[in-house]
């Protein structure tokens, strides 16, 4: 029977990780789309490949390398957005270009290309216990943040100036959201691949909007 596949531990891990990532990526995607940063997933996922290459070259976990580089890239995007608010899309374009360039150069020095390709195309059935624990912790943090900061996140995503005038700590909200997005994208790249993460971040949200511009309208379409 088809349910027999869930008797295998690796399929159980893949099933759990797939469900958890689909939930938290969708949550983050709603804010990403309304902040007009739909390509941030592509920029971060390609930047994570540079972190993977660094991890493989220096002999430590490529997942940690991907997370570290992704966080740095996300903070760079936020810094450029603050410096040039009228051209915020340039932040994503610049980071995407640098990330692809670094990944391309560093990948040439990686001896075992199969490890690097596993992040490029993903391998959800190859998830180990450590990565499962990382996804469980990350999912808990993302869901907790959305429960506690739901209104603030969407207020900032629509109008940062109005949110600041209303007393919302815009800098803190943006920092927390940026770091969570970076970590989620880098971890998801290991399961579904860096080439697909950006689609998971944007396409489901675009389909859910269905002409509604309000995030609360997703549920009524």
List each model region and its residues.
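Short juxtamembrane and helix-loop transition motifs at transmembrane-helix boundaries
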Residues: 1-9, 23-34, 51-61, 152-162, ...
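Transmembrane helix-bundle core of multi-pass membrane transporters
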Residues: 4, 9-13, 84, 92-151
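Structural signature of hydrophobic alpha-helical transmembrane segments
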Residues: 11-22, 58-72, 136-140, 186-201
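Hydrophobic alpha-helical transmembrane segments
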Residues: 15-20, 63-68, 91-94, 132-137, ...
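The first (N-terminal) embedded transmembrane alpha-helix
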Residues: 16-28, 41, 45-46
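Generic alpha-helical transmembrane segments of integral inner-membrane proteins
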Residues: 19, 23-27, 68-76, 102, ...
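Short loop segments and helix-boundary regions at transmembrane helix junctions
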Residues: 30-112, 209-221
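Helix-loop-helix "hairpin" substructures at the membrane interface of multi-pass membrane proteins
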Residues: 131-204
